[in-house]
Amino acid sequence: MRQQLQQQLGSRISFTAMVMKAMIPALRRYPYFNASIDDANNEIVEHGEINIGFATHTDAGLMVPVIKQADHKSLADISAEIDTLAEQARQRKIDLADLKGGTITLSNVGSHGKHDRVGRPIVNHPEAAIIAMTRIKPMPAVVNGEVVAQQTLDMVTSYDHRLIDGVYAALFMETLIEIIEEPGLLLGYG
C-alpha cells in the first residue's frame, strides 16, 4: 500500500503521514475530536484548522511537533514536514512555535521496539483526543474462507469524555480505519 502511494507520488511516504492524512476526513466528520475545552470560559472550542501533533522521541524526552493546517497539505508535503520537524526536534533545533497549536495528537509507538503492547496514551491537554498506532505486522486473517497472513495495524484512542462519548469515539475510529484500509482514498482528501 505504501509502496503504491510512493510510486504514484514520486516521494517517500511514512506510515505516520498516511495515518495523519487519513485522520483529516474523519476529523471533519467528527469535529469534537478536533476540539478543546476552554476551562477559563467553560466552553467548547471547535477548531476550524486541523493541526495534528505527532509524538517524537528525543534524547531530551518527548516532544510533539505540530503539522499546522494539515488539511490543506498533500500527503507528500505532510510526510516531508514530519521528517523535517522530527529531525529538528531530535537535534533540539526546533522552533517553539512548531511545538504549539496542536488540535489532536498522533503517537506512532510502533516505530520503537519489537513489541506492540501499548497502554492508553494520555490526552495532550487542552486537546480532546490522541490516537496511538502500533507497528504494522502480519497476523492471521480469513479471506475468502482461507486463513492467510495479512498486514495489520492496531490503533487506540484516548479522549476527553466531557466532549466525546464512547459511541462517537467508536464511529470516529471506524471511519479512520475504513480510510486507512482504502489507501487510494488518501490522495483524494485534502
Regions found by a protein language model. Name each.
Residues 1-190:
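C-terminal catalytic/motor cores of large multi-domain enzyme assemblies
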